[in-house]
Amino acid sequence: MEVLLGITGKDFTIIAASKAAMRGATILKASDDKTRSLNKHTLMAFSGEAGDTVQFAEYTQANAQLYSMRNGTDLSPSALANFVRGELATSLRSRKPYNVNLLLGGVDPITHKPSLYWLDYLASLAKVPYAAHGYAQYYCLSILDKHHHPDITLHQGIKLLNLCTDELKRRLPIDFKGMTVKAVTKDGIIDIEFDDDKVVKMA
């Protein structure tokens, strides 16, 4: 039931996650933050089995910060994506694999180029210009495919995200309680104010 969306642009990566923490058809929490900052320029959003998601996200966050403390430098988004993929692949071959789907995005601290990685519970890893997990895949990928281009600005990226969330409100029969939206730029991670109360008319 969770919604994850990611968009890259000229010099930024936007990651958005639905606020509703759900179990079946029941909403347990209406202000759940499904994102974790791994370092100053890398952000991860997660969905999946309730216990697995938070445990795996915090494990990844702790390992990223441990590396930074030991080596005096942060891992790049690409290095972190491959580390996460390796951990998921190892977990997949254990008796109790993590059931976690992830979007990992950031801006390289050296080249200042944005990147976004799509990972699923089977340890698949793909570098993509935009991505979605959950029900958002069915409704938003066509919109992103039509309107996205590599040189969009942050303002245009937020407008594109609005198009996606409007479509979800119009088509999905569930209330995902709005979105937590964050952007990663060369200056770090910033919270984006997002209008969750916008009423969308049916087509």
From Swiss-Prot:
Record-level Gene Ontology MF annotations: endopeptidase activator activity
Annotated coiled-coil positions are none
Family to which the UniProt record says this protein belongs = Belongs to the peptidase T1B family.
Query: Where in or outside the cell is it found?
Result: Cytoplasm; Nucleus
Its lineage reads: Eukaryota, Fungi, Dikarya, Ascomycota, Pezizomycotina
Q: Offer one example of a GO biological process linked to this entry.
A: proteasomal ubiquitin-independent protein catabolic process
Keyword Nucleus on entry? yes
Keyword Phosphoprotein appears in the UniProt entry: no
* Name of the molecule in the record: Probable proteasome subunit beta type-4
Q: How does it assemble?
A: The 26S proteasome consists of a 20S proteasome core and two 19S regulatory subunits. The 20S proteasome core is composed of 28 subunits that are arranged in four stacked rings, resulting in a barrel-shaped structure. The two end rings are each formed by seven alpha subunits, and the two central rings are each formed by seven beta subunits. The catalytic chamber with the active sites is on the inside of the barrel.
Coarse class of the protein's main subcellular location: cytoplasm
Name the InterPro entries on file: Ntn_hydrolases_N, Proteasome_alpha, Proteasome_beta2, Proteasome_bsu_CS, Proteasome_sua/b, Proteasome_suB-type
Q: Which key words are in the record?
A: Cytoplasm, Nucleus, Proteasome
Gene Ontology CC annotation, any one:
endoplasmic reticulum membrane
Function (record text): Non-catalytic component of the proteasome, a multicatalytic proteinase complex which is characterized by its ability to cleave peptides with Arg, Phe, Tyr, Leu, and Glu adjacent to the leaving group at neutral or slightly basic pH. The proteasome has an ATP-dependent proteolytic activity.
